[in-house]
Amino acid sequence: LFSSSSQEERDNLYGKSKKEGRELMIDWAEKAGGKFTGMIIPNVFGPFGHPNYNSVVATFCHKLAHNETPTIEVDGELKLIYVGELVEAILSEIRKGKSNAELVIAHTSESKVSQLLSLLECYKAAYQDKGIIPSINNTFELNLFNTFRCYMDIASHFPVKFVEHTDPRGSFVEII
């Protein structure tokens, strides 16, 4: 199995090197009689990605969770796949036991960079800042929310202090 990138189609050094690497592995497999599958993978996101490396989701989550302000360089359209969905696609391909020189892994969601940042800002404002679970409308949003949560500084965030309300009848706190 060889992991390549949807960047293969772009005219940049990274994309060219990924495509060339995949093609070299295809040649090797043919000459050596080996099996080879070259996966072309969209933008992967999920818990514990490396910020400031190759995932805008990881970078935005890390910055927001640490009270930094992310910036958008290019507000492009992203084709995304959650890491768990990618693992399922890889396992499915392994179970087939066949070579596939160019296996395009389908993206499972799309988002403009600005829309992605807006959702993450809502998660921070609701969950991290106020302790409110945000509205989750689909699987993508659930995966994105869970990704955001892994970047929070858990030691300083929890336990959450509840606001006590008191009147002549007694005291109570609101919890989820």
What are the residue ranges of the model-derived segments?
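Substrate-positioning beta->alpha
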Residues: 49-59, 73-95, 112-118
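Generic structural signal for alpha-helix termini and adjacent loop/cap motifs
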Residues: 63, 67, 93-96
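Conserved Rossmann-fold NAD(P)-dependent oxidoreductase catalytic core, especially the SDR/UDP-sugar
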Residues: 1-25, 29-32, 36-39
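Hydrophobic residues at beta-strand termini and immediately following loops
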Residues: 39, 105, 175
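Conserved beta-loop-beta element that borders a ligand/cofactor-binding pocket
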Residues: 26-49, 62, 68-79
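Mid/C-terminal beta-alpha module of Rossmann-like enzyme folds, strongest
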Residues: 89-164
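C-terminal, non-catalytic macromolecule-binding modules
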Residues: 160-176
